[in-house]
């Protein structure tokens, strides 16, 4: 009888743990779904459904706490491109000068997406480089008949920027610190560069 009670107790515990695990999984799925934006939009004269997936700020633990706090106060979520396989659109690079520790983030809030930059010299305050309606950054893709988000940012090293300028008749001197690669998925990339206290777009054509 004692062994039977022990066995029954173990089965009850195992069943309880399984139920808790399932409930946690369902809760995580519900939370992820609640961060998504869905709707219908018209692009190039065609109306289609869209889905934009977002991640919360705390999905990027590498972000300094002060920057996480400012993003949270803005109500930011981090939009993910339709081809994302890992968390993206948060960049750590030397954007102000060689060796500086700076951050760039795509912040989605209130239907708009802003490219925010936090320079190490800026005491944690954000510079808004560019803003666009989230629905203006949608496109169809081969993975689905639902439109997805197409805006991606990445660090661009001096070498990458130099390579992008090689087709110019007179390429300028190589820059001395990182820029930002601002891309449309499966489309054009422009390079944003901070110099003389302002953001510019790097020329890659004559």
What is each stretch, according to the model?
Residues 2-16:
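Bacterial N-terminal signal peptides that target proteins for export
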Residues 55-84:
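Short, non-transmembrane alpha-helical segments in secretory-pathway proteins
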Residues 90-98:
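Acidic, divalent-cation-chelating loop motifs in proteins
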Residues 97-107, 177-180:
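Acidic/hydrophobic-patterned starts of short beta strands in beta-sheet-rich repeat architectures
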Residues 111-117, 190-191:
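Structural motif
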Residues 13-25:
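Bacterial N-terminal signal peptides
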Residues 22-58, 134-206:
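Acidic, small-residue rich beta-repeat scaffolds with periodic aromatic anchors
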Residues 117-134:
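Extracellular C-terminal loop/segment signatures of secreted glycoproteins
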């Amino acid at each position: 009888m004692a062994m039977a009670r022990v066995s029954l107790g173990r089965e009850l515990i195992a069943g309880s743990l399984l139920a808790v695990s399932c409930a946690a999984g369902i809760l995580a799925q519900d939370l992820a779904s609640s961060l998504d934006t869905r709707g219908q939009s018209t692009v190039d004269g065609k109306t289609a459904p869209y889905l934009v997936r977002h991640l919360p700020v705390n999905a990027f633990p590498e972000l300094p706490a002060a920057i996480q706090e400012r993003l949270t106060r803005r109500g930011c979520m981090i939009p993910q491109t339709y081809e994302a396989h890992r968390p993206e659109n948060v960049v750590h690079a030397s954007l102000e000068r060689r060796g500086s520790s700076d951050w760039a983030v795509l912040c989605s809030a209130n239907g708009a997406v802003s490219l925010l930059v936090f320079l190490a010299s800026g005491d944690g305050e954000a510079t808004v480089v560019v803003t666009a309606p989230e629905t203006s950054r949608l496109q169809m893709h081969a993975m689905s008949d639902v439109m997805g988000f197409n805006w991606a940012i990445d660090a661009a090293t001096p070498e990458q920027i130099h390579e992008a300028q090689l087709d110019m008749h007179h390429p300028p001197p190589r820059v001395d610190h990182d820029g930002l690669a601002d891309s449309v998925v499966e489309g054009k990339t422009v390079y944003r560069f901070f110099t003389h206290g302002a953001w510019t777009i790097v020329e890659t054509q004559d």
